[in-house]
């Protein structure tokens, strides 16, 4: 770029030309209309700031403009020179002095203006002045300077006198310290390796237009590293404007800066959106979101809606937000928690929904049904217009069935109460309700319950069902008006000594159980073979007799010709039977015999006094004696196929009787 003295001579001339051209309204297309920089000892390879010029300021220069403001360049041995010019849309009528003198501490001058914020949200920036041992920060509110503009920072070593023995390096011949870096995503740090040489100060910063801003605490570290060594610098978020800056510790040396993450897709991912601070100022019909970014990027924002929190946010047509100084505004919106901003930059996007959910709902709706009409009751804190339309199930929330019914109130006191009456379309349909005096509104889906209209029919059907159930229960569970309530068991005793006779006894027991019905139990040893084998015949017999006596049942003795010798004989098998006959009361004992297996003379004299029944001829009389009354017989035999089953059992007993008699004759 030539010698430093030639550059110093050309700089005032350039400023005068630009100043005169601005006074005359003449612009230069190839010259920046908002600033001219001559940063001393500053080197960068990042595209955020462009190339830098190395112009040392070593001569007194004072330029006085014909306008009410002027530009001055001070003589400095080692300083950062910066000149800001006014343009058609830039700085207006301002006097700016930027002088960085030789000091052990860095100085930063920041100029702000009050933001023109969208109504009704207002943001106030108060003048502040902060002085610390680390650096000087002076903030001056100005109505003419954008908050995106002036940022200048200079860092000096804590003790530059220790480096007086080192040779001064010319900024035009030296590009600053050489270093390399490695990204450590797991540790969220950057490892910086310094080339051989003197000690170097290394830090991470966020590159803006005129300044590489330091990271927020506790990541604003600046470490001193010896040549040939490495150091790890932690970062909070991996951002596209994250830079690595290194400089020697001596005064006014060239700083080398690398901003490698601008082209990394990872820098525009989740870390980028986590670093953005969203502030919601939405109210009434205006969606307002203010963003605080850590990188000088301009985002795009549009309105989207999501049906629930687990689905994607669907973009709405013609719903691009207006941006002004980091404020994104969308007018004529019916505020709802599921109407959200979708911010995007390149291929990366983020959905941010309104935070003030408690104060968003300015109206609500309830419904009532009357005859063939649906009545919608609207309650609103402001004057508004509401619409409703039917929606068929399965067609989606945005599908309407004409016509659309509308009600509004533009005048009167607040709050507003409105009623909208619409006729029923058909059962199963739902109605969509929304505010129609805005451009973007969330549609509420309401499904009326009209089941009560059929309540009378349901009650009649229920009564008929209950009546039928009562009749069935009465027919199946009715008991006789007289007599004991519980069913009385029947103990069937026999002395069958052949397989044919045992089959005959089993068939008779099955016939009795089916004929008695009503839950009557027939006790026979053939059906309890395991229990008899476990406890023994005699204990089982006495246990069964005790149960029959306790439940007021009946003992039926089935006699055969070979069962017992005359009682006067010394047959030991007669002892248990005689003991049972003496123990059991006489009304509980009945005697039955098959005519082919036993004659009247075969019955011992002690048993002839018992009621006797000849099978199968006296079976109906036996059933009556066993308390099988007509109602039991009717409920048992009156069912479908009961007579056929009874007849088949009678035929089985008759056949088994003939077979047993034939075998007895053969024996």
Curated annotation (Swiss-Prot):
Keywords: Cell membrane, Cytoplasm, Glycoprotein, Inflammatory response, Membrane, Receptor, Secreted, Signal, Transmembrane, Transmembrane helix
Extracellular side: 24-454
Keyword Repeat: no
Regions crossing the membrane: 455-475
GO cellular component: cytoplasm; extracellular region; plasma membrane
Top-level taxon in the UniProt lineage: Eukaryota
GO biological process terms held by the UniProt record: inflammatory response
Tissues of expression: Predominantly expressed in mucosal tissues with high levels in keratinocytes and colon epithelial cells. Very low expression in dermal fibroblasts. Expressed in various tumor cell lines.
Pfam family, one: IL17_R_N
Signal peptide extent: 1-23
Subunit relationships: Forms heterodimers with IL17RA; the heterodimer binds IL17C.
Protein name: Interleukin-17 receptor E
Organism: Homo sapiens
Organism phylogeny: Eukaryota, Metazoa, Chordata, Craniata, Vertebrata
């Amino acid at each position: 770029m030539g010698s430093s003295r030639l550059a110093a001579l050309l700089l005032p001339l350039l400023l005068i030309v630009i100043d005169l051209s601005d006074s005359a309204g003449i612009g230069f297309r190839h010259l920046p209309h908002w600033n001219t920089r001559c940063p001393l000892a500053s080197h960068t390879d990042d595209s955020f700031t462009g190339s830098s010029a190395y112009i040392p300021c070593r001569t007194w220069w004072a330029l006085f403009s014909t306008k009410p403001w002027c530009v001055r360049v001070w003589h400095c041995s080692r300083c950062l020179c910066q000149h800001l010019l006014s343009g058609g849309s830039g700085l207006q009528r301002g006097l700016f002095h930027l002088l960085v003198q030789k000091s052990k501490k860095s100085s930063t001058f920041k100029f702000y203006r009050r933001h023109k914020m969208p109504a009704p949200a207002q943001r106030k920036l108060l003048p502040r002045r902060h002085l610390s041992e680390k650096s000087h920060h002076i903030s001056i509110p100005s109505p003419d300077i954008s908050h995106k503009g002036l940022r200048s920072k200079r860092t000096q070593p804590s003790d530059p006198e220790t480096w007086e023995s080192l040779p001064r390096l010319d900024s035009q011949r030296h590009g600053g310290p050489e270093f390399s870096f490695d990204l450590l995503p797991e540790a969220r740090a950057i490892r910086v390796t310094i080339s051989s040489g003197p000690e170097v100060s290394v830090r991470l910063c966020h590159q803006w237009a005129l300044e590489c801003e330091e990271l927020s605490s506790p990541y604003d570290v600046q470490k001193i590293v010896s040549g040939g060594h490495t150091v790890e610098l932690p970062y909070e978020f991996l951002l596209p404007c994250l830079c690595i800056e290194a400089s020697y510790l001596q005064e006014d040396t060239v700083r080398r800066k690398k901003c490698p993450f601008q082209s990394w897709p990872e820098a525009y991912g989740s870390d980028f959106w986590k670093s953005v601070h969203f502030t919601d100022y939405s109210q009434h019909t205006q969606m307002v979101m203010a963003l605080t970014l850590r990188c000088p990027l301009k985002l795009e924002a549009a309105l989207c809606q999501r049906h629930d929190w687990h689905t994607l946010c669907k973009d709405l047509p013609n719903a691009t937000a207006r941006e002004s100084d980091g404020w994104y505004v969308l007018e004529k919106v019916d505020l709802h928690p599921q109407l959200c901003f979708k911010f995007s930059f390149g291929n990366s996007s983020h959905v941010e929904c309104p935070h003030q959910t408690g104060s968003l709902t300015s109206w609500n709706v309830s419904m009532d049904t009357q005859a063939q009409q649906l009545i919608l009751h609207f309650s609103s804190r402001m004057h508004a217009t509401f619409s409703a339309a039917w929606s068929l199930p399965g067609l989606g929330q945005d599908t309407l069935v004409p016509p659309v019914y509308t009600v509004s109130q533009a005048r009167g006191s607040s709050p507003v109460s409105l009623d909208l009456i619409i006729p029923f379309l058909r059962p199963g349909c739902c109605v969509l309700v929304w505010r129609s005096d805005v451009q973007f509104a969330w549609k509420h889906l309401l499904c009326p319950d009209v089941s009560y209209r059929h309540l009378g029919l349901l009650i009649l059907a229920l009564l008929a069902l209950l009546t039928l159930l009562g009749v069935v229960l009465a027919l199946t569970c009715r008991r006789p008006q007289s007599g004991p309530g519980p069913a009385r068991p029947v103990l069937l005793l026999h002395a069958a000594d052949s397989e044919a006779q045992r089959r005959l006894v089993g068939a008779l027991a099955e016939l009795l159980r089916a004929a008695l019905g009503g839950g009557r139990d027939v006790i026979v040893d053939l059906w309890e073979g395991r229990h008899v084998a476990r406890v023994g015949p005699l204990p089982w017999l006495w246990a069964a007799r005790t149960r029959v006596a306790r439940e007021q049942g009946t003992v039926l003795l089935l006699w055969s010709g070979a069962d017992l010798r005359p009682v006067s004989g010394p047959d030991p098998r007669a002892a248990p039977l005689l003991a049972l006959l003496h123990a059991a009361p006489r009304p509980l004992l009945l005697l039955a015999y098959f005519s082919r297996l036993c004659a009247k003379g075969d019955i011992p004299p002690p048993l002839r006094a018992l009621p006797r029944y000849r099978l199968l001829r006296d079976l109906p009389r036996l059933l009556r004696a066993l308390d099988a009354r007509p109602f039991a017989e009717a409920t048992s035999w009156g069912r479908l196929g009961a007579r056929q089953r009874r007849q088949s059992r009678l035929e089985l007993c008759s056949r088994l009787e003939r077979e047993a008699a034939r075998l007895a004759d053969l024996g």
